[in-house]
């Protein structure tokens, strides 16, 4: 048997690759097989699918010496019961199970056949273990009046293994080397040192920071910090200089200028007050590093 397989492989020219379409499998190869006509290049073997295991198809259906990922063969449907229409798809090691809906095969807008998908399961139904082996079974819908009745049961098959995808490692959304701490820990060392060390003396500026640290422990740091960042002036760029006004200024424009100047002074004073909180916050960091 091996000698026959070797002679069969040698008859295939080097570099030959067999990749027929669904239409070609049904409209040419299967049609000629049912009609018992000669096929120009006989590269599709006859296999009794239900007397062979799927992993043996690679050697039995090899075409030439090129590496293959698909294997083609003719098979004859074996009825499960003599008077029934159900097909027997059991092998020694398992069984083939149909899955999904059959797909129509058209040639020049004419329905010529259907494609059925089969999956191989190890063991016995209904407790079989699903494998990666899949078969596309093509059967003809055309009438073959001149063909013997026994030839109507031929199908052409494409066997292949389902590609297994390797899961890729998800990117981490955070860097484990970075430290994370909440706002309350920023001033906590300074407050803890004052509570646990009786000899600790704080300057008036440090005492003010300690009082603010107590507010942080009570969850009041957000309101203190938001006083600085919630101001609309904080995110605005400095205003451009306005063009010089005409020499003649009406009393209304003078009043508007005085009001604008007064508002700018109040806004500037508010910005200074807001910045003091941030300055105190930054100063606390230098104090903590100095104490260490």
Curated annotation (Swiss-Prot):
Q: Which domain of life does the protein's organism represent?
A: Eukaryota
Q: What happens when the gene is disrupted?
A: Reduced secondary wall thickening in vessels and collapsed vessel.
One Pfam family assigned to this protein is NAM
GO biological process terms, alphabetically, are:
cell wall organization; positive regulation of secondary cell wall biogenesis; regulation of DNA-templated transcription; xylem vessel member cell differentiation
What coarse category fits the chief subcellular location reported for this protein? nucleus
**An annotated GO cellular component:** nucleus
* Reported tissue expression: Detected in root protoxylem and metaxylem poles and in vessels of protoxylems, outermost metaxylems, inner metaxylems, shoots and hypocotyls. Expressed in roots, hypocotyls, cotyledons and leaves. Present in developing xylems. Present in root developing xylems. Specifically expressed in vessels but not in interfascicular fibers in stems.
In terms of InterPro entries, this protein maps to: NAC-dom, NAC_dom_sf
The region called Disordered is annotated at 237-269
Role played: Transcription activator that binds to the secondary wall NAC binding element (SNBE), 5'-(T/A)NN(C/T)(T/C/G)TNNNNNNNA(A/C)GN(A/C/T)(A/T)-3', in the promoter of target genes. Involved in xylem formation by promoting the expression of secondary wall-associated transcription factors and of genes involved in secondary wall biosynthesis and programmed cell death, genes driven by the secondary wall NAC binding element (SNBE). Triggers thickening of secondary walls.
What does the record say about domains?
The NAC domain includes a DNA binding domain and a dimerization domain.
- The identity of this protein, by name, is NAC domain-containing protein 105
Q: Which gene is the coding source of this polypeptide chain? A: NAC105
